[in-house]
């Protein structure tokens, strides 16, 4: 491989790492922004303090999607930001705008809306909105991890700590 080819490969790799890093940053910002509605939704969704704390570990590999009230909280949080239709399905346009409201959100908005939509299609038969939304969230997390856009728990915890100090 010639020097020019190696230089080109290096530039492409650095660009890809930068793009992935930017996507993860956007995902972190969207996660934190979305999470701002959690406290307001805690009572409505009958979420205990313990289960509410579980939300801070959403991006951990071993996070469990097994409590209906987590799905109810996600539904409430989505409604808080007007991200759901009357049938508790994703409102594509509003979700796109919500994601784009974050710095560099336009980089990831189309991908995120597509991932959520594909997950909704997989779980559309579930009649209970809370359970369906919980399954969609699980599918979304798996899809984000596979796509390399899921933020690490280390990054999320550092951000949570920084926000608590403010």
Swiss-Prot record:
One of its GO terms (biological process) is sensory perception of smell. Keywords: Disulfide bond, Olfaction, Sensory transduction, Signal, Transport. The keyword Disulfide bond applies. Olfactory tissue; expressed by the glia-like support cells that ensheathe the sensory neurons and line the base of the sensillum lumen. InterPro entries: Odorant/phero-bd_Lep (IPR006072), PBP/GOBP (IPR006170), PBP_GOBP_sf (IPR036728). Residues 1-22 form the signal peptide. GO terms for molecular function: odorant binding. Present in the aqueous fluid surrounding olfactory sensory dendrites and are thought to aid in the capture and transport of hydrophobic odorants into and through this fluid. This is General odorant-binding protein 1. The gene is GOBP1.
